[in-house]
Structures are given as C-alpha cells and as structure tokens.
Amino acid sequence: MPKRILCFGDSNTFGWIGSLEGPTHRFPSDIRWTGRLTALLGPDCEIIEEGLGGRTLRDQFTVGSGVFVPGAGLCGKDYLPACLLSHLPLDAVVIMLGSNDMKSALNRSEHDIAEGMAELADIVLKFPWQELLDYPRPRLLIVSPPLIGARKMELAGERYVDAPRKSRALAALYKKIAESRNAFFLDAASCLTDEPAGEAHGPDGMHLTEHDHELLALGIAGKLKEILSLR
C-alpha cells in the first residue's frame, strides 16, 4: 500500500498564484509543491492536498482574506480533526501554517502563533481515533512558513504590522514544538534560496512562485524520505 501523506496548509499549499489585482488562479498540480512531491517521492507515495487560502492555526475568521467560506472553515484547529478522520490511514502529516495568523487584525504574537501550532501538533499526535479505527498514528512534519519581507510591507504594511519580525521568530519556536513531541521540523525559508532569500517571491510578496514551489518541494521531499525511510 502506498505511503499516504497529508499536506495541510493555507494558500501556499493550495497553490495560489500571487497577483496584484483581480481574481487569480492556482498553479497546476505538477507545479504546486504538493504535486511535485508525487514525482519526487514516486509511486509508493500518495499525496493528499488540504490547502485553503486564508486558513489560520486557531482563529475562526481572517479579516480581509477574500475567502468566501464561514469563519470556522478557516480555523485549522477546528477543521483538522475531521480532515484527519476523512483521510485515514495516514503515514505522515505535513503542516505549514502561520502566515495568516500574523495579520494585524488578529493581534497574535509569535508566541501565540506557536501555541496554535502546538495545538495542531497535539491533535495529530494525540487525537483518540484509535478507539474506533485501528490505524497507527502518522509521523508529523511541522514546516515554518516563508518569511514576510519588504515587498509585502510596501503593499500591505498596515495589515501586517510587525510581521517581518514575527515571521523570523517562528522557525525557532516551531522547531522546539517539534522536538518536544518527537516530531520533525523544516524551515521553509531555508529552502527558498532566490533573493531575497527565505521569502516568497510572488508579486504580492506573500505567495510562492513556480520556482519557489520547486525549491520547497525538494526540501520537503528530502525530509519525508528521512521520516518514512524512503529511498
């Protein structure tokens, strides 16, 4: 049976194409980092995409997100249990969230955001589905999101006050969460080597470009091979 890997995230898992105006599209599946995992990991792995624009770790709304779903639908903490149960069995879960939580309207510090990630990690690692379904728990890979830099602040700085500093603090906090739970960690910023390094390079300063998706896929694939003992 193929290794089943759930990728849970926001618009950068969905494959949102950054745009400065008007409706946009998502990258095709073979361009998105999730789709590239299929090619990189081979036929012995099945990738399950669960990306939603505007998703937060534990807030039930995202002001000005432009996403037309009820507020609770954007809350990772509320949605994740049903998501896990609907996709069992799972061998690994990859979570990359935190960018939307840095919006000024939510008033979340970097420590608040990290606490939200800890709650999601505990759902994956402690949720009692084994009372009903006899499947082992998946391994967990926590991914800190790309950095927020000058480009995003030029375009929407009032919506992301202090976000550059917060985004640079998350990697260390997320790593501690992973280490304390026998989970795994990857810093997405370490994969994004184009200048300015560590940031998403879309025109809106928030979303990944095609090359960013390629680089991130390589980093995550390498980590999953380690986690799942894949060749």
Predicted regions, residues:
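Serine-esterase "nucleophile elbow" of acetyl-processing enzymes
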Residues: M1-V63, P81-H87, V93, E210, ...
